[in-house]
A protein has these predicted regions:
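Accessory terminal regions of nucleic-acid processing enzymes
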Residues: 1-353
Length: 353
């Protein structure tokens, strides 16, 4: 599927530092490659691979089912499914990709649907999740207590459409979708676009709407109301414009935030670099705490931050290739001691030590 060339709703959380799956660098690389095919190859970057995960597959399979449940819950038809909207945040909107390009509207979204009859209009947004994730990340139904990335996605859609409310409908599965697939339940899309759930143990496929209705009867369907938040939207627009003008139009890399960012921006690290005082201090800090931590804790995240900051420094410091660093990055202290190295081993794994 072609990637959007603008800031879409699914990318919004990444630009605000609220995504578990994307970073500003990965979003930037996707946008730049979509706008200018071959951009990554010319710059020596690697385009991030977007994996079609089981969560995505199940989400797509149950989209229509959630629309039916949401429409029945409110007693209002839902229309304009997958309708395109775009804006630059100045109160003018486009409803086709062609018009958005003509007007320079760089914020886009495809809505899941629009409730007929609401004035001002209310948007429909559907989600699927597991029972464990639901109970650890959502608040009481009827409130706006949803994960930050969903809140941001809804605010983005309201920016793009001018709507003032999103009804977020959540279908909860008692198990993770990976567990359902391990049990043999696989969502399959037919040639005419109709989804079904196949299982080789059964003769007939399962219609997602029948499954969804059963879950709803068991209390696994919930709705949340997300209202337009002008202050948050203003901050989002400020960040969007900075990213668009500096990073996209200016073709400047965002600051890397993860080891995956470093791998994409510099897939073939070579050369020797001399650390400055701040990098030396960070590496000493890393050595002092890494033996006492777990990777998931606050100190573990700090160690990861130090690694990323060190490698970003090495990437921009003007490395000199010598006999010892012709196949790796080598970081030396100001007095010539070896502080760290970074290289790709024979299996293709990147090693920092």
């Amino acid at each position: 599927m072609p990637q959007p060339i603008n800031i879409s709703a699914s990318r919004a959380a990444a630009l605000l530092g609220q995504s578990e799956y994307q970073t500003p660098v990965s979003v930037w690389l996707q946008i730049m490659e979509a706008r200018d095919p071959g951009f990554c190859a010319r710059r020596g970057y690697i385009l991030p691979v977007i994996e079609y995960t089981p969560a995505m597959r199940w989400g797509h399979a149950f989209e229509s089912a959630i629309v039916e449940l949401a429409s029945a819950e409110k007693g209002t038809p839902i229309t304009d499914r997958e309708k395109f909207f775009a804006t630059s945040g100045a109160g003018e909107y486009s409803r086709t990709p062609e018009l958005s390009l003509e007007r320079g509207h760089f914020l886009t979204c495809h809505i899941d649907g629009l409730y007929i009859g609401d004035d001002p209009p209310s948007l429909h947004e559907g989600k699927t999740t597991s029972e464990f994730y639901y109970h650890t990340h959502f608040g009481d139904p009827g409130t706006d207590k949803v994960p930050p990335e969903y809140q941001i996605q809804c605010q983005h859609q309201m920016i793009c459409t001018g709507a003032e409310r999103v009804i977020l409908s959540v279908l909860v599965f008692p198990k993770r979708v990976e567990e359902w697939e391990e049990m043999g339940y696989i969502p399959v899309k037919s040639e005419n676009g109709v989804w079904r759930i196949d299982n080789e143990k059964f003769i007939n496929a399962i219609d997602p709407i029948e499954w969804a209705r059963t879950l709803a009867e068991m209390g696994f369907f919930h709705q949340y109301e997300i209202h337009a938040h002008p202050e948050l939207q203003s901050k989002m627009l400020t960040r969007y414009r900075e990213f668009w003008e500096v990073n996209v139009l200016g073709a400047r890399e965002p600051e890397p935030q993860s080891m995956d960012d470093i791998k994409c921006l510099c897939p073939s690290p070579v050369g020797t670099v001399v650390a400055d005082e701040s990098i030396e201090r960070m590496l000493y800090e890393r050595e002092s705490i890494k033996s006492e931590i777990s990777a998931s804790g606050a100190l573990g995240k700090r160690v990861e931050q130090i690694k990323v900051a060190t490698l970003d420094y090495m990437r921009n410091a003007g490395a000199v290739i010598d006999d010892e660093s012709k196949d790796k990055w080598l970081l030396l202290s100001r007095d010539g001691r070896k502080l760290a190295s970074y290289y790709r081993d024979k299996r293709g794994y990147y090693i920092f030590r």
